[in-house]
Amino acid sequence: MMKSFFLAVTILALTLPFLVAQEQIQEQPTGCEKDERFFNDKIVKYIPIQYALSRYPSYGLNYYQHRPVALINNQFLPYPYYVKPGAVRSPAQILQWQVLPNTVPAKFCQAQPTTMARHPHPRLSFMAIPPKKNQDKTDIPSINTIATAESTITPTTEAIVDTVATQEAFSEVIESAPEAKTDQVTSTVV
């Protein structure tokens, strides 16, 4: 809102002296020449644009603002594209600037200016580097050692046989088989 107001005031201030001069030429008063010239100097001296520029220096007329130029090599876009500068950037987004020759043809009386174009240089931390492959070795299937498989506990039943020979068996003739005692033992195998 304020910028459009100051733009309107600036345009009015620039055109006001021409309008006043045109009206004075059309009127052609029959007064003294010295008084008329003194009156015109007063009008030109106190134009509002000078008051606005002295009062608000940040809104001064700057027709040659420095704007970064991004070159676009497009046959349908003969003019450079002006980039709006960003206010806040992270360190990863800060780009390097490189001086390149201007691709826009200059007129024969002007020197060829140089423009600035951005070229990103990514950091190594953002790049994925593939591992080197040896051509001499045969391919070994890779086993994923990081993946964890949930182990299921399977109970197993084993028969443990204890042979117990009693003292009576030693005194007798060994004709019968020794007594066999079986116990159920459960163990967890992972």
Curated annotation (Swiss-Prot):
Protein localization: Secreted
Matches recorded under PANTHER family: KAPPA CASEIN, KAPPA-CASEIN
Pfam families assigned: Casein_kappa
Recorded name of the encoding gene: CSN3
InterPro entries: Casein_kappa (IPR000117)
Record site feature (Cleavage), residues: 126-127
Modified residues (Phosphothreonine): 166
Listed GO CC annotations: extracellular space
Protein name per the record: Kappa-casein
Signal peptide from the UniProt entry: 1-21
Family (UniProt): Belongs to the kappa-casein family.
Keyword annotations: Glycoprotein, Milk protein, Phosphoprotein, Secreted, Signal
Reported function: Kappa-casein stabilizes micelle formation, preventing casein precipitation in milk.
BP terms from Gene Ontology: lactation; protein stabilization
List of glycosylated residues: 152, 154, 157, 163, 186
Residues with PTM Phosphoserine: 187
Tissue-level expression: Mammary gland specific. Secreted in milk.
Keyword Amino-acid biosynthesis recorded: no
